[in-house]
UniProtKB/Swiss-Prot annotation:
Gene3D superfamilies: Tubulin/FtsZ, C-terminal domain, Tubulin/FtsZ, GTPase domain
Xref: PANTHER family: CELL DIVISION PROTEIN FTSZ-RELATED, MITOCHONDRIAL DIVISION PROTEIN FSZA
Regions of compositional bias (Low complexity) in chain numbering: 464-482
GO cellular component terms given for this protein: cell division site; cytoplasm
Keyword Nucleotide-binding (UniProt): yes
Name used for this protein in its record: Cell division protein FtsZ
Keywords, comma-separated and alphabetical: Cell cycle, Cell division, Cytoplasm, GTP-binding, Nucleotide-binding, Septation
Localization of this protein: Cytoplasm
Record InterPro entries: Cell_div_FtsZ, Cell_div_FtsZ_CS, FtsZ/CetZ, FtsZ_C, Tub_FtsZ_C, Tubulin/FtsZ-like_C, Tubulin/FtsZ_2-layer-sand-dom, Tubulin/FtsZ_GTPase_sf
Amino acid sequence: MAISLSAPRTTELKPRIVVFGVGGAGGNAVNNMIEAGLEGVEFVVANTDAQQLQFAKTDRRIQLGVQITQGLGAGAHPEVGMSAAEESFPEIGEHLDGAHMVFITAGMGGGTGTGAAPIIAKCARERGILTVGVVTKPFHFEGRHRMRLADSGIQELQRYVDTLIVIPNQNLFRVANERTTFAEAFGMADQVLHSGVRSITDLMVLPGLINLDFADVRTVMTEMGKAMMGTGEGTGEDRALMAAQNAIANPLLDEVSLKGAKAVLVNVTGGMDMTLLEVDEAANAISDQVDPEANIIFGAAFDPSLEGVIRVSVVATGMDGASIAQIEPKPVSRNISAAPLIAETSRPAPQPEPARPTARYEAARPAERPVAFAPEPAPEPEIVMSAPQPEPEAELYYDEPTVAEEPRVSAAPARSVNRIVDPLVDDVAEEPLFPENNYYEERRPQKQGGFFSMFGGGRQRYEQQASAPQAQARSAQSARPQLQPIETPQADDAEDLEIPSFLRRLAN
């Protein structure tokens, strides 16, 4: 009887994560991650430029489009990069077989990254691999044409990835200073990808008190659109709160907000000195910034190398609704603000025309007012107190149809002068006062002048008693029409006719 002794076959069950660098920017990001010593992932580099591909620090390289580009690059034409990736589609699939998660990193706006990244994402999606895209947008000084190519490439890539993270290169100016070198600035952008990948690998490598597995990552990141990944560290007092705030506030990411996140994965990592209150403080600091209905998955792990340091990693996804809500109201507010401006400028145009005749009437009224106030100042308060109560109701109905322009002109002075009384009542009460006083005042000198003119000489007495020059002008105007049919010459003619005619006839 033969006895065979053999070691039991054990299969290592752990997720396989691949970082796929596409184009020149993607290859540089992979090289920086390899130099940083990131472990637990596989690195693959694909490029149409054979010369640039030789500088890759990984042995897994793919020459895209050998027949199409012949290793000379895509020439900043995305359609060339797309055709090159389609030519190398089988080789791309070989590197993706067996992977559970793939990070596709590229720089948008060029030829290879813009055109080939969507094809690689499509290949990964066909195999059911959790696909995350981490791409950069060009600087503003690179021109609008390159920015339009980047936007179209991002839209095409978003069709095939589960989660997309966009890093505008222009945001590097938020963290860079005068001494920041060009290489260091791009290293900051690559750090976003590095921290995001490390936050995923730490979940599966480090022992967790509150364990998180790859299934939780898939739940948070599958079919979630725009995402935000950040990692923050803190030391000293309030280190947990500082780490949480640094993880959320990443100035390099595109304009996204945690308010609209549908799913959030939070992992707090620290040394053996990490306390329960610190874990609670870090978790609450992030949950307060998220919608209460969001799916929050929390985990905590220990890392002996982080003695005195707390690290918080956040993966928030599903923020397309928040970004759209921030963009849509802007053009609406401009249209709303522009509409009243057009209406306001068109309305006051006819107003200055009626304002001119009113100025003429107002200029004529002050000439009549001194006549009213000079002889009789006392009867005015009696008219103000008694007249406006019964008269305004009747005058409102008569003045509105006949005079349409008076309420507009009288409304302006009523606001500044009359503060206690209703301006509508004041306008009605003020209008009949002046014509009534002028009416009676014009009648009185006419009666006196007509009465004294019958006897003669009374006109001179009235003119001597009047002291105001304006009253003399008023009496002169009323007396002049009566001086034209002068009766005195008629009496003289009568005397001339009576004396010679009667005397001669009687004498004869």
